[in-house]
Amino acid sequence: MAQAPVSPVVLVILDGWGYRQSTEANAIALAKTPVMDCLWTSYPRTLIHTSGKDVGLPNGQMGNSEVGHLNLGAGRIVPQELVRISDAVEDKSLLRNPALVNICQEVRDRQSKLHLIGLCSDGGVHSHLDHLIGLLELAKEQHLDQVCIHVITDGRDTNTNEGINAVAKLESSIKEIGVGRIVTVSGRYYAMDRDRRWDRIQKAYDVYTQDRPGDGRSATEVIKDFYKNSITDEFIEPTRIAPGAIKSGDGVIFFNFRPDRARQLCYALTMPNFDGFERELIQPLSFVTFTQYDPKLPVKVAFEPQNLNNILGEVVAREGLKQFRTAETEKYPHVTYFFNGGLENPFEGEDRELIQSPMVATYDQAPAMSAETVTDTACNAIEKGIYSLVVINYANPDMVGHTGNLEAAIQAIETVDNCLGRLLTSISKMGGTVLITADHGNAELMVDENGNPWTAHSTNPVPLIIVEGEGRKIPGHGGAVDLADNGRLADIAPTILEILQLPKPEEMTGRSLIEPIHLEIKQNRTPVRISR
């Protein structure tokens, strides 16, 4: 006898959809969002925290997509690499880190150069300037005299023109410590692409590896000149400041701790079978990354991954249930790698579908992005009736919010709201349950206190709405179910497990946000199990 179609639990992550009461420069409040407005007023909802200590970051530190999806999938507050590495800098254990000490010794023995590559920013999302300064202190202790710094400017997780202040602070630290020189400057648009736009990576790669003379300007002077031409930090073209190309026998430390935007440049610098663009592989090359960017990379790792056991995807798979993940290119690693606690490979019964993001320079040129195709894919998966858990990410609020273009962000929000309506129809047809939330804020705050475009994330809370269909038009429980206040992203996985009627493992320290005294569970839910 054929199994009955499954009534899925669907987690919809509206990336960058924060909550802020003021409507000024608030793309979410200014957009026409009839679907979300109806859900917010008609169904159980609450606000949850996505920043600072609530997600394993320092107090007051804005959340981000990597951190958000880690916490969402893990069902616990995950101590973040930012804190882990900052502690190592502060307590001086960085100076004894085996991978870092060894590469310094190799460079010293070969009398070659040590290159430090990474985002020069105090944004705390991909890196932190204090970590770079800690590496300079390490180089001094290891008596290195050829330390080349390849600055990547931010302008995305910080104000658009904050780079000059970060570089000035770096130049001051170089002078104080007595080690290092800035040899290149590049905006993250080029050096940290993650969407396989290899022409961008190649521009940074060529500047890093080719012998080109500087023109006598300092790094701050170069940045000022770009500002004069209305080119902000993110888009600074790769520029040689001083001699110091990466050559055979050198050592490289990539000090970004977040993997997704560091991988492509590392592939180009280290992988023998790299095919993104034509280049001659530099060998030998000692290479250390702060964290594990990709297990396939032929590099040493300074801070090995933390093992996360009994995360949501693992629990669902162990119960023999099927699950589905989909997102477009920009957020695909987040619903797979990060949601699975840093594991590349899917769990048994976990299917995935990647949707290509539009090939545009910046997403304000295409604010709809690929949301419609993501929705088509998700609806098809839901209506197959075989998946107990479906995880979907809509990238628009975050990726368009990062451009600082308010009108485009409003269009992005309206696109996602329309897609939600279609998605809810499919979920209703299957009698499923949907949880709608976000990983962090962004699009609700589009200008800073001075009225300038704000392109970074926020520390604002995000919505959580739960809607359970019972064979009607998504009526749900209405007022019969409450959602607890003061929740965190870590509480989402336990909430999903409670709806699926699966036990919460002890490693999950989050709590279900469904108030127990009001909990109503459909007793006829029929999960589809994988045959063994």
Swiss-Prot record:
Its pathway is: Carbohydrate degradation; glycolysis; pyruvate from D-glyceraldehyde 3-phosphate: step 3/5
Q: Which residues form the active site?
A: 65 (phosphoserine intermediate)
Which reactions fall under this protein's catalytic activity?
(2R)-2-phosphoglycerate = (2R)-3-phosphoglycerate
Binding, Mn(2+) 2? 15, 65, 439-440
Q: Report the family membership.
A: Belongs to the BPG-independent phosphoglycerate mutase family.
Function per UniProt: Catalyzes the interconversion of 2-phosphoglycerate and 3-phosphoglycerate.
Official protein name in the record? 2,3-bisphosphoglycerate-independent phosphoglycerate mutase
Lineage, uppermost ranks: Bacteria, Bacillati, Cyanobacteriota, Cyanophyceae, Oscillatoriophycideae
